[in-house]
Amino acid sequence: SDCFGRYDPTSTGPNLLPWSEWLYYTQFGDDNRLNKVFPVLAAYYKWLKLNRTWRNGTYWSSGWGTGMDNMPRVPEGYNTIYSNGHTIWLDACLQQIMVANILLKMGFYLERWQEIEEFEDDIKNLSAYINKNMWSERDGFLYDQYADDSLSTTQGIYAYWALHTDVLPKQRLDRLVEHLDDTCKFNRPHRVASLAADNPKYKANGRYWEGGVWPGTNYMVVSGLVEKGYRRLAHDIVMNHYNNVLKVYKKTGTFWEYYAPEDAAPGFMARKEFVGWNGPPPNADLK
């Protein structure tokens, strides 16, 4: 049975169902389904706002909570997987902005005004905070923010949830996107590495989220690039990912949980037979 701990940082995952439901609706126009799922999706957004925010309205999570178990994000002394690290988690903030925008579209269409009346202010306030406090002008990158207001130095793929929002002005977004083409960062033999290659924790075999190439985050990056007009870069990444997945399939006869960033090979301790997880994304990316 489903269960959660209201104050357990690992008990909830990324709030992505509104994204999938909206894509489903735009393709099939199922009004009955949209009417059924909207109140649940709106309620969960509000639950996260109530139970996963710091007092300034920004969001927290954890390694497990973001789905990126061992990504090196929290300060020393905190558990990488289980702790929120007294940190403002960039992807959790960006995902809530994305979701609020989607719920606004749903709410306007369904004329459910009362359930979405504060969402525009949420988007405005959270976007302003990220731009002012979580952007490094020196690095041209978005980071998590620690309790002492300093920024993390970890450059992770989670920053590219910004592509699914209007948080960054064009000049800043261009700089963020440039890192995807940088061979010292995310442009490795198999794209897109989940952790920048110049990070001390980066592993050639991926070691899960210490550089591993994951189908879900690749889909997030590619679809965001297309949405924001970076179509050439999106095409290059798609073809690279598709060809690497195909090479590994020809060698092993199966699809894998995730892949190594430095070679056409499964990632370290990756599980095989992940067809539902890794079979569709290359084809979805190609479309």
Could you tell me what each predicted segment is?
Residues 90-130:
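Active-site neighborhood of glycoside hydrolase catalytic domains
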